UniProtKB/Swiss-Prot annotation:
Provenance organism: Nephroselmis olivacea (Green alga)
Family membership noted in the UniProt record: Belongs to the tRNA(Ile)-lysidine synthase family.
Protein name (Swiss-Prot/TrEMBL): tRNA(Ile)-lysidine synthase, chloroplastic
Molecular function via GO: ATP binding; tRNA(Ile)-lysidine synthase activity
Gene: tilS
EC number per UniProt: 6.3.4.19
Domain of life (superkingdom): Eukaryota
InterPro entries membership: Rossmann-like_a/b/a_fold (IPR014729), TilS/TtcA_N (IPR011063), tRNA_Ile_lys_synt (IPR012094), tRNA_Ile_lys_synt_N (IPR012795)
Disulfide bonds: none
Predominant localisation class: plastid
GO terms under biological process: tRNA modification
Amino acid sequence: MKGGRVQVITKNNSIAKHQLGEYAVHIYVLLYYLSMREILREFEEACLLQGLVSPSTRLLISCSGGQDSVTLLFLLCQLQTNWTWRLGVVYCNHMWRYGSIETPAKLARICLLFGVSCSFSVSGSRLQKEEEGRSWRLRVLCRMSSIHSWFYISTGHTASDRIETLLSNVLRGSSSSGMRSINWYTSLDTQVGHRRISIPIIRPLLGISRLELRNYANRWKLPLCYDPSNQDQRIRRNRIRHELLPYLRHWWNPQIDRLLAQTAEVTSWESSYYDLICTQICQQYEWIGDGGVRFPWRIFHSIPTSLHSRILWIFLNRALVFLNPAHGFQGNFDILQFLLETKTCHCRHGSIYISKDVDWLRMTLVK
């Protein structure tokens, strides 16, 4: 009896353990599935709460074929039915690495799988620096948006990209405006014919980390294109990603990513408020009869010094685009530095004649 009883108890225990193991597996699968649904819910909430995009609109996705941009495309396709979006994909090939010519073929198959139209652009000249590549990509996106009437441009920037950009800006000595890193929503101003238009750029993945997207992409077995340049330690951003951030997590704070993301969000709010104030002040400029523009310099006597460069930068971007649209970012920046360093002047700076005294700043185009 004892032996049989012991055998029955042992058998029941083994059955109970087996059932408990099955329950644990089911619970794990359920939690994993819910976490995948959580990503989609966070993504849709970001579109709603941040006011990024409206329903029934045309949305162009800047896609590199990598994890972030393909996951962005997949999430948008999942919500496409409810939001009635019209989606399109554009791929910009910088010709920076060997094998990049194979990426468009893979991306074309991905777009065919999702039922999304796709376009490809190849750089006609050799791009040496990352900033040159970014400027070229923006020009391509502007041209595609204006030609095919895309109302929004969406990029795959994540919370991890935001943190890396914040650290990069801090390490190179940026102002509070630069510390706000990447924003949820920006606008891209471009010239189309004789009119200037503004195209919204949205980043709906800014609340999701790269690790969460990797798990999501692996769960759905999304077809991704591998970019070996992301492992190149000669690129500063990669050193921040693979060396600095792991060091900070290990030796400083395991939650450093969350804290830096909060810092980026707070500085973004503060900088947006400062920009609003400076924009209102900047509206005091006047156009003068000889085709020039003047700005009341005397207002700087009653304004904090920290706002001077912001106000001047907004003013220069507004005024010089009409005086000389080809002046460019670097030309505007050079004039900004020149104005901040001199008290009074009457001189020519490139194609712009500058006259500055205690009360007024005047600028005219030299013909």
